[in-house]
From Swiss-Prot:
<dbReference type="InterPro" id="IPR049557">
    <property type="entry name" value="Transketolase_CS"/>
</dbReference>
<feature type="binding site">
    <location>
        <position position="367"/>
    </location>
    <ligand>
        <name>thiamine diphosphate</name>
    </ligand>
</feature>
<dbReference type="InterPro" id="IPR020826">
    <property type="entry name" value="Transketolase_BS"/>
</dbReference>
<dbReference type="GO" id="GO:0008661">
    <property type="term" value="F:1-deoxy-D-xylulose-5-phosphate synthase activity"/>
</dbReference>
<comment type="similarity">
    <text>Belongs to the transketolase family. DXPS subfamily.</text>
</comment>
<keyword id="KW-0479">Metal-binding</keyword>
<dbReference type="GO" id="GO:0019288">
    <property type="term" value="P:isopentenyl diphosphate biosynthetic process, methylerythritol 4-phosphate pathway"/>
</dbReference>
<feature type="binding site">
    <location>
        <begin position="149"/>
        <end position="150"/>
    </location>
    <ligand>
        <name>thiamine diphosphate</name>
    </ligand>
</feature>
<dbReference type="GO" id="GO:0009228">
    <property type="term" value="P:thiamine biosynthetic process"/>
</dbReference>
<comment type="pathway">
    <text>Metabolic intermediate biosynthesis; 1-deoxy-D-xylulose 5-phosphate biosynthesis; 1-deoxy-D-xylulose 5-phosphate from D-glyceraldehyde 3-phosphate and pyruvate: step 1/1.</text>
</comment>
<keyword id="KW-0786">Thiamine pyrophosphate</keyword>
<feature type="binding site">
    <location>
        <position position="76"/>
    </location>
    <ligand>
        <name>thiamine diphosphate</name>
    </ligand>
</feature>
<dbReference type="GO" id="GO:0005829">
    <property type="term" value="C:cytosol"/>
</dbReference>
<comment type="subunit">
    <text>Homodimer.</text>
</comment>
<dbReference type="GO" id="GO:0052865">
    <property type="term" value="P:1-deoxy-D-xylulose 5-phosphate biosynthetic process"/>
</dbReference>
<feature type="binding site">
    <location>
        <begin position="117"/>
        <end position="119"/>
    </location>
    <ligand>
        <name>thiamine diphosphate</name>
    </ligand>
</feature>
<dbReference type="GO" id="GO:0016114">
    <property type="term" value="P:terpenoid biosynthetic process"/>
</dbReference>
Length: 621
C-alpha cells in the first residue's frame, strides 16, 4: 500500500469527487503530511499551504473545476491545489530549475485559471471572468480566494466596489483569514449561521420578502436594516454587505463539516457573495503552528527535527547590511523613519522595528500609499527610508514620479531583490528597475558591487537632498565586510578595479565578481560604475578613447537599462569603440537557483567571456 493511499488515487478533481464525503478528513491528513514531507525536500512556502488544505479540498470537491474558475490571490498557498489537480509527482521539482512554479501559472495547468504572485489581484480577475461568463450566457462560477493581508490593499476594495453593483454575476469571494482564531461558542454559532444564510430556503424567503415589501419601499428598507443589524451583532461582515455582497461566516476553514455544506449552498446562489473562513498558518504541524513566520518560506530541512539554526558564521546578505545600516543611522538621526509595505522580515527591518518602534511603519500591502506617505514625511523635514522589493516598487510607479521625483523630495529607497531572485521566478525577479528608474528626472540610482559599498551607498542616499535609490540583489555578494565608518561617495563617479588592454568591462552592480573573473581571461579593464544615474560620463569617455570594445554588464533587462545609457553617451563621440551590452534578455525568466539562472542567460564568468569572444577577436579587429 502506498504511504498516502487516498491521495495516490487522485490525479484530478474528478477523482476527488468520487470519494465519499466521510473520507475527506483522512484525505486532508494525508495531503498535509505529503506537503510537509515534500516541501521539506525542495524548500518553498509551508505555513500558508498547511493552512489551506481543507479549503483546497472543499473547493475542488464542490465546484466543477476547471469549468468553474478559482483564482488564488498571491498564489503561494496553492501547493494543495496543485497536488489535487494532477501535479503530485511534479512536486519533487517544485521551484527548481525546469520544475513547476511555486505560484499558479496558466501555462502549467488549465486549473491555474490566472497567474498570480503579487497580491490583491484575485477579485478583479475573478470579476472579469464572471462578467465574461454572464456575457456568454454561461452558468459557471468564479471564485476568488484572498488572504486577510491581501484584502487590506486598495486594489481589492476597488474590485469589491465594482462587483457589488452587479447583481447578475456568479462571483464568490472567499476571505482566507489566518490572523485570528474562533473561540468555540462563536465558532459553533457562526457555523450554523453560515449554513442558514447560505441556504436555499433562507435566500428564497429573502427574495420573496423583497418582492412583497417592494410595494412599500420604507418597509423594505426597514427589513434590510433589521437583517443587517442582526447579522452585524454576530458577524464582522457589515463592511462587505455595504459593498453589495451577501456575507457569510466566519466559519472554521479547517472544519470540512462546515465548509462543504456552506459551499454547496453558495454554489446554488447567483450574485456577488462573500464567505469568511478562519484558518491557521502551519495547521497540523506543531513546529509551524508555533512559529508560522519561520516556516513561511523554508529551505530544505529535516521535517522530524524541524529547522535548525545554522552553526558557524552565516553568510552576510545585502538585506542584513541594510538592516544594520538603518539602525546605525537611526541612532544618529531621530528624523529617520523606516517604512515597509508588509515586508518587515524580508527587507531586514525586524531589529529596527524592535529598537525604534515609534519610527517604524509597516503600512501593509499598500505600495502606492507607502511612497506618498513617505513624500508627506519628507515635506515636513523627516528622512523617510522606504524598504521595498524591486518587483513591488513597480506597483507604485506613478507615486514615485508624481509625488516624489517631480517635487524633488528627499525620499530614500532601499530596493531589495534586484536582479534574479531565484526560486520565486518571473513574478519576483527585479529585472526592470534600472530601466524604469533611469528615465525619471531628479532621481539618483546606485548599484553596489559588494556589501561595504552597499553600506556607503545607503549613507550617500541618506545624505543626498533629493530622491535616491540603492538597488541590491537577494542574498550575499563578494563578502566584503562593511566598514563601521560611513562616508558619502561622490555622486556620479565610478572607479577602475582592474587595468587591461583593448577591452573594458563597465559593470553596474552585482556582476563585478563575475566580470573580474572574466577579465583575467581577456586581460580586460574593469570599471565599477557604481551610479546608473547620473552616469560617470568622464570615465566612459576615457575608456572609449583607450579601448576597442566597451562591454556593459548589468543584472537588469538590456532594453532601456544602463547599457542603453552608455550607448547614448557614445553616440556623441566622433571616434567611438564597439559596444556590447550584456544583461537580461527580453523574456520572462523562470525560477531556479540564482547561479543556474545567471549561467542560463550567459552572465556567469564563462558566459561573459564567450559573448565577448563571439563579438570581438583581437586578431581580427
Amino acid at each position: 500500500m502506498p504511504p498516502y493511499p487516498l491521495l495516490h488515487r487522485i490525479d484530478s478533481p474528478f477523482d476527488l469527487r468520487k470519494l465519499d464525503r466521510r473520507e475527506l478528513p483522512a484525505l486532508a491528513a494525508e495531503l498535509r503530511a505529503f506537503l510537509i514531507e515534500s516541501v521539506s525536500k525542495t524548500g518553498g512556502h509551508l505555513s500558508s499551504n498547511l493552512g489551506t488544505v481543507e479549503l483546497s479540498i472543499a473547493l475542488h470537491y464542490i465546484f466543477d473545476t476547471p469549468e468553474d474558475r478559482i483564482v488564488w490571490d498571491v498564489g503561494h498557498q496553492t501547493y494543495g491545489h496543485k497536488i489535487l489537480t494532477g501535479r503530485r509527482e511534479a512536486m519533487s521539482r517544485l521551484r527548481q530549475f525546469g520544475g513547476i512554479s511555486g505560484f499558479p501559472r496558466r501555462s502549467e495547468s488549465s486549473y491555474d485559471t490566472f497567474g498570480t504572485a503579487h497580491s490583491s489581484t484575485s477579485i478583479s480577475a475573478a470579476l472579469g471572468m464572471a462578467v465574461a461568463a454572464r456575457n456568454r450566457g454561461e452558468q459557471r462560477r468564479s471564485i476568488a480566494v484572498i488572504g486577510d493581508g491581501a484584502m487590506s490593499a486598495g486594489m481589492a476594495f476597488e474590485a469589491l466596489n465594482n462587483a457589488g453593483d452587479m447583481r447578475d454575476i456568479n462571483l464568490l469571494v472567499i476571505l482566507n483569514d489566518n490572523e485570528m482564531s474562533i473561540s468555540p461558542p462563536v465558532g459553533a454559532l457562526t457555523k450554523i449561521l453560515a449554513r442558514m444564510f447560505s441556504g436555499r430556503t433562507y435566500n428564497a424567503a429573502r427574495r420573496a420578502g423583497e418582492k412583497v415589501l417592494g410595494v412599500s419601499p420604507p418597509m423594505l428598507d426597514f427589513a434590510r436594516k433589521v437583517e443587517e443589524h442582526v447579522k452585524g451583532l454576530i458577524t464582522p461582515g457589515t463592511l462587505f454587505e455595504e459593498f453589495g455582497f451577501h456575507y457569510y461566516g466566519p466559519i472554521d476553514g479547517h472544519d470540512l463539516d462546515a465548509l462543504i455544506p456552506t459551499l454547496q449552498n453558495l454554489r446554488k446562489l447567483n450574485g456577488p457573495h462573500f464567505l469568511h473562513v478562519i484558518t491557521r498558518k502551519g495547521q497540523g504541524y506543531k513546529l509551524a503552528e508555533a512559529d508560522p513566520v519561520l516556516y513561511h518560506g523554508v529551505s530544505t530541512f529535516d521535517h522530524t527535527a524541524g529547522i535548525q539554526t545554522a552553526k558557524g558564521a552565516a553568510k552576510l546578505t545585502y538585506t542584513q547590511v541594510f538592516g544594520d545600516w538603518l539602525c546605525d543611522i537611526a541612532a544618529q538621526d531621530e528624523k529617520v523613519i523606516g517604512i515597509t509595505p508588509a515586508m518587515r522580515e524580508g527587507s531586514g527591518m525586524v531589529r529596527f522595528a524592535q529598537e525604534f518602534p515609534n519610527r517604524y511603519y509597516d503600512v501593509g500591502i499598500a505600495e502606492q500609499h507607502a511612497l506618498t506617505f513617505a513624500a508627506g514625511l519628507a515635506c515636513e523635514g523627516f528622512k523617510p527610508v522606504v524598504a521595498i522589493y524591486s518587483t513591488f516598487l513597480q506597483r507604485a510607479y506613478d507615486q514615485l514620479i508624481h509625488d516624489i521625483a517631480l517635487q524633488n523630495l528627499p525620499v530614500m529607497f532601499a530596493i531589495d531583490r534586484a536582479g534574479l531572485v531565484g526560486a520565486d521566478g518571473a513574478t519576483h525577479h527585479g529585472a526592470f528597475d534600472l530601466s524604469y528608474l533611469g528615465c525619471i528626472p531628479n532621481l539618483v540610482v546606485m548599484a553596489p558591487a559588494d556589501e561595504n559599498e552597499c553600506r556607503q551607498m545607503l549613507y550617500t542616499a541618506y545624505r543626498h537632498n533629493g530622491p535616491a535609490a540603492v538597488r541590491y540583489p537577494r542574498g550575499g555578494g563578494m563578502q566584503v565586510g562593511p566598514e563601521t565608518a560611513m562616508s558619502a561617495l561622490p555622486i556620479g563617479k565610478g572607479e577602475i578595479r582592474r587595468s587591461g588592454h583593448r577591452i573594458a568591462l563597465l559593470v553596474f552592480g552585482s556582476l563585478l565578481f563575475n566580470a573580474l573573473q572574466a577579465a583575467e581571461q581577456l586581460d580586460a579593464t574593469v570599471a565599477n560604475m557604481r551610479f546608473v544615474k547620473p552616469l560617470d560620463v568622464t570615465l566612459i569617455e576615457e575608456l572609449a578613447a583607450s579601448h576597442d570594445l566597451l562591454v556593459t554588464l548589468e543584472e537588469n533587462i538590456v532594453i532601456g537599462g544602463a547599457g542603453s545609457e552608455v550607448a547614448r553617451v557614445l553616440e556623441s563621440l566622433s571616434d567611438r569603440p564597439q559596444l556590447l551590452r550584456l544583461g537580461l534578455p527580453d523574456t520572462f525568466i523562470d525560477h531556479g537557483d540564482q547561479s543556474q539562472l545567471l549561467e542560463s542567460v550567459g552572465l556567469d564568468a564563462p558566459g561573459i567571456v564567450a559573448a565577448i569572444r563571439r563579438r570581438f577577436s583581437p586578431d581580427n579587429n
